[in-house]
Amino acid sequence: MNSPSPMLPPASLDDDALAHALASGAAEVLLALRAEVDAAGGSFVAKEVKDAGDAAAQAWLAAALAAARPDDAVLSEEAKDDASRTRADRVWIIDPLDGTREFAERPDAEAPAGQWRDDFAVHVALWQRGAGLTAGAVALPARGQVLTTADGLVPGDDSAAVLAGDRPLRIAASRSRPPEFVAALAERPDVELVPMGSAGVKVLAVADGTVDAYVHGGGQYEWDSAAPVAVARSRGLVCTRLDGSELEYNRENPWLPDLFVCPPALAPRLRELLDTVGVASVVGVDSKEGAQP
């Protein structure tokens, strides 16, 4: 697939602006690839589109980071892990295409060429030694959105309505295979599951108020959550492990089993609900089997 690549961002950008430019550029690459599929008649093999998207976005991001921040280390889902990053002071943690399944799917079997699922994302985050996640951006290419750590706090959430019992607690969940404890929560009348695609889409759905929380225990990697967590924290959300412990990034093993994201006012209530379904049994699970973002 031969669409022209976006221009590489200049090295003069600060880290927040660079994260935005990187996520935006990779988003352009992915949308151009979809446009090529449609221009060729609209029929495609999903695996080929997934692989092409992963490869094209990774190649552009790698070139852009090498040009703009040549001395920084990189941890990417789509590149071989270089163990020397654990000794670096600055590490970019990226997922060039979060939600490959959604990227290569139409909304339904009858959808014509030009119509695609929109719940996939591009993740770009910067980790710095002694400071943790310091910059990040998440692009939702098909929705034309890029959210960054430079956006700042947003207006208050609707937590009061949940706490008062006026409406159920809305929890973002995997549309294909939610963790068992999340499915158990859905049996409660005061909880509503909202199925959606990639991990980035789920976390940002909490940030923009579409849902109240995202809790995950099926296993992820650092690139699945680093950028969404950076953006969510910049908007005042609680982002921790399920047991309340800190999320740690740029570890030797990038496996990060679980995630808890919600507004501060809802955190105590959500933790109480998780206790009722035995969530402690999944915290810290170290198996990579069955991971679903």
For the regions a protein language model found, what residue spans apply to each?
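Short helix-loop capping/hinge motifs at secondary-structure junctions, enriched
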Residues: 131-132, 153-158, 265-270
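DPxDG-like acidic metal-binding loop motif
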Residues: 85-152
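N-terminal subdomain of lithium-sensitive/metallo-dependent phosphomonoesterases centered on the IMPase/IPPase/PAP
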Residues: 1-97, 107, 184, 281, ...
